[in-house]
Amino acid sequence: MAEWNRDETQWRQGLLLASDAVEALGLDHSEFSERTLVIVASHDCDLAQSPEKEPHIEVVIGRLAPEKDGNSTHAKNARKLHIEFTGADTFWAEFEATAKVKVDKLELNRFSPRPETTLSPERHAVFQMRLASRYRRSAFPDEFERRLNLKDFKLHER
């Protein structure tokens, strides 16, 4: 098993796992295994901590998006994110909030991140906002939702 050295780890939040890591760690997308993408969700500070303090790394299993969905970009949707990766390959990826899993830090350390694609600093900030928005959002009571859907509610006239 690989050792952990906080000063030498290549792993950072927002990096993609290479296909050999995805396969070895059994992280295939449940519906689109041939289009699987896995992104590191854990914060850099947590990644730097020793395995005794932070034994796992959170990742999100996603896929290559067939096309960009504007309703899922810029962290507008708390459940789904479409985000662009650039570099040698430029493509859109889709990640769902419910597809977050934990990976053993030492197991992941046996592998290197996917080198040819990255998130721009702006897209990385969007990814962080999306992670936070899953837990920091307004909860509307059922009665509020019901009233919005009433046909005689004034919003329906506009």
Where are these regions (language model features)?
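Generic structural hydrophobic/aromatic packing signal, biased to beta-strands
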Residues: 14-19, 40, 57-62, 83, ...
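C-terminal terminal-subdomain/extension
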Residues: 1-4, 30-32, 71-158
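Short N-terminal edge-element motif at the start of the domain
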Residues: 1-43
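Compact nucleic-acid interaction/catalytic patches
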Residues: 32-35, 41-77
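Residue-identity detector for glutamine
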Residues: 10-13, 49, 128
